[in-house]
Every structure is written in structure tokens, then in C-alpha cells.
């Protein structure tokens, strides 16, 4: 459901989104959360909850360290608004899926609010797989994304 991308485009320009969601159903559900005002509410909580703010700064440090291990983007912050605000839940959920539970508090929170998008089988058609056993196996394997590393 998430892929790790190169921090630079082929022309050398920065591409700060390290973790990119590949499932259109998940991306759509996240867009619904964004449209509902969740990001503004999360950003306000950063101002009043020092422990949450510290955890979010740690998520930012984790994100930047993983990106910089591939290619350093001097002067470019991490994605999603980290560490001072919440700007893109897609980036935060991608980070949460790739890093695992407990690393990105807002990514974890948004992920917990999503419907079970993986229950319907693969997010995109799989070549050679019909609606039969192959799709069921894919759905079973993805039934609990917290139990597997999705990238």
C-alpha cells in the first residue's frame, strides 16, 4: 500500500515525499479525513500537548533520517507539514505504514480512523488473478496491515 520513492526526480529536483501511497481506496479515504478538518484539529493539539509535539518531532527526525540515508536534501523539510503542523495526511499515513506503529503519532491516528480499505482485495487488479482464490488470498494477507510490513 505504500512505496518508498527516491528523494530526487530524474532532473535532480527534490521530491520530498519519501513514502507514497499506492492504493486509490486508501488515498480516497484519507482525502475524506483531510476534507473534514482533521488536519487543523491535529495542528491545534500540537500547541497544547507537549508530549504529542515531542513525538511528532521524533517522527520528523525519523522521516528525514530515512530520506537522507538515500539522498540528502539540504534545506528541505520532511513531508506532511512535520514537525510544526499537519499539512498532508497522505504523507503521514504513508510514513506510519512504512515505519510501523508508534513512530508517527498522527499517521497512526489517521490510519486508525480509516475504513478497512484492504478488505476488498488488492487495491489494483493483479495480472492473472481473477475474482476467485487469488483475490481472496490477497485480501487475507492484507487483512491486518499492522501485522505486516506493507512496503
PLM regions with names:
Residues 1-136, 140, 144-145, 149-151:
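Preference for intrinsically disordered or flexible, low-complexity segments
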Amino acid at each position: 500500500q505504500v512505496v518508498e520513492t527516491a528523494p530526487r526526480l530524474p532532473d535532480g529536483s527534490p521530491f520530498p515525499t519519501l513514502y507514497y501511497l499506492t492504493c486509490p481506496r486508501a488515498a480516497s479515504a484519507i482525502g475524506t479525513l483531510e476534507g473534514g478538518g482533521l488536519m487543523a484539529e491535529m495542528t491545534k493539539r500540537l500547541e497544547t500537548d507537549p508530549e504529542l509535539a515531542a513525538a511528532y518531532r521524533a517522527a520528523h527526525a525519523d522521516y528525514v533520517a530515512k530520506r537522507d540515508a538515500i539522498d540528502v536534501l539540504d534545506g528541505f523539510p520532511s513531508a506532511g507539514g512535520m514537525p510544526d503542523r499537519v499539512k498532508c495526511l497522505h504523507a503521514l499515513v504513508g510514513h506510519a505504514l512504512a515505519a510501523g506503529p508508534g513512530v508517527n503519532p498522527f499517521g497512526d491516528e489517521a490510519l486508525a480512523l480509516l475504513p478497512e480499505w484492504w478488505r476488498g482485495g488488492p487495491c489494483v487488479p493483479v495480472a492473472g488473478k481473477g475474482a476467485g482464490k487469488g483475490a481472496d488470498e490477497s485480501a487475507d494477507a492484507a487483512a491486518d496491515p499492522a501485522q505486516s510490513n506493507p512496503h
